[in-house]
Every structure is written in C-alpha cells, then in structure tokens.
C-alpha cells in the first residue's frame, strides 16, 4: 500500500477523515448510466431473476411467516412522507431542503426488521431452492409452500449455513435458515448488540461471539464453512446473491412512488441516502435504482465518522486493500450495523461508476436525529438507520454536487428518500436508552 503520507497528499480529504470529522465526498469517477452499465458485472436480467425467485417463494413465506399474509408473502416496507421531520431538519441545521422528504421504512420489514431481510433472506432461499431442485424435492412449477413440511425440514437439517455479521444480517440469515430447517451458525463481531444475539439463540441459531471486529467474524465464518462440504457460507463481502436480493427493492419502490404520484424524470430528480457498512445493502439498492431511473437518480452512501471504510476505499481506489485501521481510525461506533473497517471490493468496484458520493456522520448526530424523528414523526429507528437522515441537509448545503450536475434549478421538484435500515425489533428498554442519549446530546448542543 502507498505510504499513508503519500495518500494524504494525494487525497487531502483523508486528513479530515483521520480526525473523524464529518465530510461529504463527491465521486469524481461517476459516469453516465449508459457508459457505466456497459462494464457492469451484473445486469437487469440478474435482478429480474432474483425478483422471480422471490415470487416463487411467496406462498411459502406467507405460510410460515403470518406477518406477511397481507402482502401475500412479499417482504416489503412502507414509504412515508415525513414533513414534520423535514421542518425540524431545516430549523435545526438552518438549511432549506429543496424538494420533498420521504422515509423508506426497511426498519419495519417483516421477519427480521431491517434492510437485511432483503438480501439475507433472498440468498438463503436461493440456496434452499438449489438444494431442493437438485434432490428432486421441488420443481420450479410447484407451489413452494410444500417446503413447509417435516420431510423438507429433515432434508435441510443435513446441511448447514454460516455467516459473519455485526447483527442485522445475522438476524435475517439466522431466522430464515432456522425456519427452513438448516443448521445455522452466526459468527458475531464484538460490536454486535446483546439483544440480537439473544433473539437468534431463542430461534435455535448457534451464535459464536468474537472479541474482534466484523472482518474477523467473517473470516472465521468462512474458515468454518471451508472445512465442511455441507456448509454454505453467506459471504457478505463478495456475495452477488445478497446484492441482487437488495436490488429487487428498486422496482417495489418505483411502484410506491407511482402510488404517491411522485414523478422521477430529468426535471424531477430523485436523491437516495443509504447507510453503508460493508456495502452490499446500499450497493444493491442503489444498483437496482440506477437500472430503473438511470441518470435521474442520485445515490449517496452514509457512514459513521469512525468507520468510513467505503468512502476511503472508493476515494483512494484501493477498495478492500485498505481498512480504516490502516490510517489510524478505530472502527468503534454505536452504529453497530455500519461498524465495518474494510469495505467489499466487489461492491466498491461495481458501484464506483454509479455512485454520486458518500458522507460521514458522527454517533452524536445519529442519536440527535433518532430523538428528533421519534418526536416529530413517532418513528423509532436504531442509530445506524439514521445515517441517511442528514443527507438532504448536506447535499443542499454543500452544493458542489448539485452545481456540477446542473440540478440547482430542478431541486424544488425533486424528491429525497432516506433509507431507514433497521429498528423495529429493538427491545423497548434499549430504544429508550437510545432516546435518552439523543435527549442528553440535544440539551448539550443547545
């Protein structure tokens, strides 16, 4: 790796990142959609394939997770207008937000209460389908609800699934795998919250805890799976299937925007702010949105000031060859879902030509935003899920991106979507603690 001093000279923004200051980085490598898609390792066909697979499984999902009955086994979340929060942001940050503000509530996705219910559940279902088809338990024409049988559960019990996680991916993989009958092990990093470990164990999942961070948990999970031919490893750092499971969100969102009569075109730009850990969730969603809205959607990743792994990987072009710890950042944050020191090289390289930018936000800010959203809209998210909330303020305030893309005149007709990535499964006492922290920090600030 280039010497750190050389990197700092080449990328002056690194100095601010090292000081854990909040920054906004505009991606100089973003290309027009038509150019970017030509070199992409994934295509619209891949996303369609994932969408069809989820449809095939819908009857099974509706049967085994009654909370999805109403949506006929489709795992989806509400898209809500949040005008009171918008007013509060404008007042608190003394910055007008041009355009409408909405919250995509993946925090309230059924089954596992986070964005990871998309990619995680999808990858487990795909693996189950492959095994069942190979062994004649299923044909693609069958009603997949037949998988809810003792015979199928006994069959899947011969196989195991492993994953490394800071929490939410572990929940979605663990809950789904256990429901199908797989033996499942979740390797959890030091920052994983206790209640997430407890919940998994209550579902019959084997949880292994590590003193080290996320990368170590993934490494150990991979090692265990390599030693056991019947074990399938969900590789959060490199998985195309996870990525595609997230990408399906885009066409669902398109339908919701149409229902709300919100237009997205050249005169009506769409901005989407996505909390980013290793990169799979936000990368997949952003990729799906780019396929649909091309140059009319502008996607920004949001990371904690203490874990800006994707920003550093993208900015330096080193991707997964650099970790935040290499430049003296500690990767310690209360935004547990985003506490990742080394980004996914696959996601970074795939998204580099599509992504508008990336910004960082402090833990203190996340807590204040958590309290504000609860007060104004009565919506409770976990700290990491608030990372996107400051995005519209940042992009409108530091308007270099808007100027560069000649969007200033179009902003009044634009739409901002903050992706709320998790929170509905947080136990009440834990959420009260988050709220109180936000309250104390708000008083301090004033």
UniProtKB/Swiss-Prot annotation:
GO terms for biological process: D-serine catabolic process; isoleucine biosynthetic process. The keyword Lyase applies. NCBIfam families: D_Ser_am_lyase, PRK02991.1. It comes from Bacillus cereus (strain 03BB102). Pfam families: PALP (PF00291). Its cofactor is pyridoxal 5'-phosphate. Its EC number is 4.3.1.18. The lineage of its organism: Bacteria, Bacillati, Bacillota, Bacilli, Bacillales. It comes from the Bacteria. Belongs to the serine/threonine dehydratase family. DsdA subfamily. Keywords: Lyase, Pyridoxal phosphate. GO terms for molecular function: D-serine ammonia-lyase activity; hydro-lyase activity; pyridoxal phosphate binding. InterPro entries: D_Ser_am_lyase, Ser/Thr_Dehydratase, Ser/Thr_deHydtase_PyrdxlP-BS, TrpB-like_PALP, TrpB-like_PALP_sf. It catalyses: D-serine = pyruvate + NH4(+). This is Probable D-serine dehydratase. The modification N6-(pyridoxal phosphate)lysine is found at residue 116.
């Amino acid at each position: 790796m280039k010497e750190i001093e050389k990197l700092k000279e080449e990328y002056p923004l690194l100095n601010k990142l090292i000081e854990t200051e909040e920054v906004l980085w505009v991606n100089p490598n973003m290309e027009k959609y038509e150019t970017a898609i030509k070199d992409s390792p994934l295509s619209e066909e891949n996303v369609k394939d994932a969408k069809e697979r989820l449809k095939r499984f819908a009857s099974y999902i509706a049967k085994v997770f009654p909370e999805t009955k109403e949506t006929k086994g489709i795992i989806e979340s509400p898209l809500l207008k949040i005008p009171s929060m918008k007013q509060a942001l404008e007042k608190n940050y003394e910055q007008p937000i041009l355009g409408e503000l909405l919250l995509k509530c993946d925090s309230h996705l059924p089954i596992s209460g986070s964005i990871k219910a998309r990619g995680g559940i999808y990858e487990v279902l795909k693996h189950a389908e492959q095994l069942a088809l190979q062994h004649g338990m299923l044909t693609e024409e069958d009603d997949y609800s037949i998988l809810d049988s003792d015979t199928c559960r006994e069959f899947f019990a011969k196989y195991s699934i492993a994953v490394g996680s800071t929490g939410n991916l572990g929940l979605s993989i663990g809950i789904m795998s256990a429901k199908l009958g797989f033996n499942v092990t979740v390797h959890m990093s030091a920052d994983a919250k206790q209640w997430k470990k407890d919940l998994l164990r209550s579902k019959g999942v084997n949880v292994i805890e590590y003193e080290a961070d996320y990368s170590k948990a993934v490494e150990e999970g991979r090692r265990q799976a390599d030693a056991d031919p019947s074990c399938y490893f969900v590789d959060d750092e490199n998985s195309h299937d996870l990525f595609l499971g997230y990408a399906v969100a885009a066409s669902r969102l398109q339908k919701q925007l149409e229902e709300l009569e919100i237009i997205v075109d050249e005169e009506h730009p769409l901005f989407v702010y996505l909390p980013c850990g290793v990169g799979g969730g936000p990368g997949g969603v952003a990729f799906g949105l780019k396929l649909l809205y091309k140059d009319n959607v502008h996607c920004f990743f949001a990371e904690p000031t203490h874990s800006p792994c994707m920003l550093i990987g993208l900015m330096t072009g080193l991707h997964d060859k650099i970790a935040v710890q290499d430049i003296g950042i500690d990767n310690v944050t209360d935004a547990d879902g985003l506490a990742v020191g080394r980004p996914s090289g696959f996601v970074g390289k795939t998204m580099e030509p599509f992504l508008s930018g990336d910004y960082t936000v402090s833990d203190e800010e996340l807590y204040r935003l958590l309290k504000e959203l609860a007060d104004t809209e009565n919506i409770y998210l976990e700290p990491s899920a608030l990372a996107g909330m400051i995005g519209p303020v940042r992009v409108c305030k530091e308007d270099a991106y808007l100027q560069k893309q000649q969007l200033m005149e179009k902003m009044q007709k634009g739409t901002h979507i903050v992706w709320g990535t998790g929170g509905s499964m947080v136990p009440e006492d834990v959420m009260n603690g988050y709220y109180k922290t936000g309250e104390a920090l708000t008083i301090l600030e004033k």
